[in-house]
Amino acid sequence: MLIGVIQRIDDKYESTRLIQLFMNERSTKHFLGLLAITIFLLFYQLVAPPNYFDFGALTKYIDYSAIILATIFCVLLTFSIFMIFRLIYIYNVPEKLQKHLIKRNDIPRNTRKAWFELFIAMLKQNNVDVLRDCYQELYDWTMSLREGRQWTVMEYPPELYEGIISVNEQLCMQQKEAVSIKNGNDIVNVMLDGVQFTIMHQNTYRTIWTCLNQQLFYKRSEWILKYWGAA
C-alpha cells in the first residue's frame, strides 16, 4: 500500500522531498512500527513454547500473554490504519497538503524545501487556488522574518533563496498567459522591503540578479521592467 502511495506522490508532485516527509510523518512511523510488532506477535503466538511454571493468579494471563498482546496491538494497528489513511488523503489533495506543510510555527528547513517543490508542481499544473495560497505564504514568511529587524541587515535563510530561484526558473519556462497570478515579478519583489525598513543583504542582491538573469535568458524583459519599477 505504501509503495503505491509513494508512487502516487512522485507522479503527482515529482518531489523526492515530499516522499521523504511522508515516510517521516509520525502517523507513518507509528503504522510501520505497530505493523511490525503485530506481525511478530502473531507469529510468536504460533511458535511460543508452553509455560511450565506456576505464577499463581498470574499464570492464566502469562499462558495467554501472546494472544493478549497480539489483540492489543491489532486494535492499535486498526486505529493507526485510520490515521495513515487520513495522511494519505492530505498528501493527495494539494490544498490540504499546502496547509499541512506550513501548520507549524517553526517549520524545519527540509519541510520548507519540500514546500517549494510543491509550489513548483502547482505552477506546472496551473492550480490557481493553491498557487494563491503559496504566494500568500511566501509573503507572510518574508514579513515574519523581517519583523523586529528595522535598520539591520536582513539575510534570509538559504532555503528561501534557493526556492525563489527555482520557482522563478519554472515561471520563466512556462508559457505566457493573458491573465494570471503568475504574471509579473512578485516572486522576486517579495524580497524587497519598503515597509519594515530592513537593509538588504549581499545574498539577497545576488539572488535577485540571478532571477533577473534567468528572466533575461527566457526573454521576459517586461518582468525586469516591473522589477525596476518596484525597486
Q: Language-model features: where?
A:
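Binding/recognition "hotspot" determinant
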Residues: 17-22, 48-231
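Transmembrane alpha-helix detector for multi-pass membrane proteins
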Residues: 1-51, 78-88
